Curated annotation (Swiss-Prot):
Tagged with keyword RNA-binding: no
Subcellular localization: Nucleus
InterPro entries: ARM-like, ARM-type_fold, Cohesin_Scc3/SA, SCD
UniProt record similarity statement: Belongs to the SCC3 family.
Gene3D superfamilies noted in UniProt: Leucine-rich Repeat Variant (1.25.10.10)
Pfam families hit by this protein: SCD
Keywords: Nucleus
Domain called SCD: residue spans: 10-95
Presence of the UniProt keyword Nucleus in the record: yes
Cellular component annotations (GO), alphabetically ordered: nucleus
The protein's name in its UniProt record: Putative STAG3-like protein 2
């Protein structure tokens, strides 16, 4: 019963009208994915993180990128992120020019983790877009 409730919770809270609630939800989903990867590191939960990469509020995007940093920073989990990375890599790369400085900085840090822990995912073109910024 608890797992059933937890399965529905992100769907409701990730679409909440309050950005604070969306930010908390994404932060916690990231924690769940790291702690209980067999249950929560799945496409059905990763999609919420992917959707919030586009959120209009800075704090939600920052929490989203930080949650992804926690996942990409763990080599044991990166193999399970291949499909997600394929779908959202271009968006993650484009976030380095986000209008909010804090989001752009976290996006660069995320790309560094992807480069270190997932060989061959970032192409030269992706890396070249980061060079002028750093």
């Amino acid at each position: 019963m608890i797992f059933s409730m937890l399965r529905k919770l992100p769907k409701v809270t990730c679409r909440d009208v309050l950005p604070e609630i969306r930010a908390i939800c994404i932060e916690e989903i990231g924690c769940w994915m790291q702690s209980y990867s067999t249950s929560f590191l799945t496409d059905s939960y990763l999609k919420y993180i992917g959707w919030t990469l586009h959120d209009k509020h800075r704090e939600v995007r920052v929490k989203c990128v930080k949650a992804l940093k926690g996942l990409y920073g763990n080599r044991d989990l990166t193999a399970r992120l291949e499909l997600f990375t394929g779908r959202f890599k271009d968006w993650m790369v484009s976030m380095i020019v986000d209008r909010e400085y804090s989001v752009a900085v976290e996006a660069v840090r995320l790309l560094i983790l992807i480069l270190k822990n997932m060989e061959g995912v970032l192409m030269d073109v992706d890396c070249e877009s980061v060079y002028p910024i750093v």
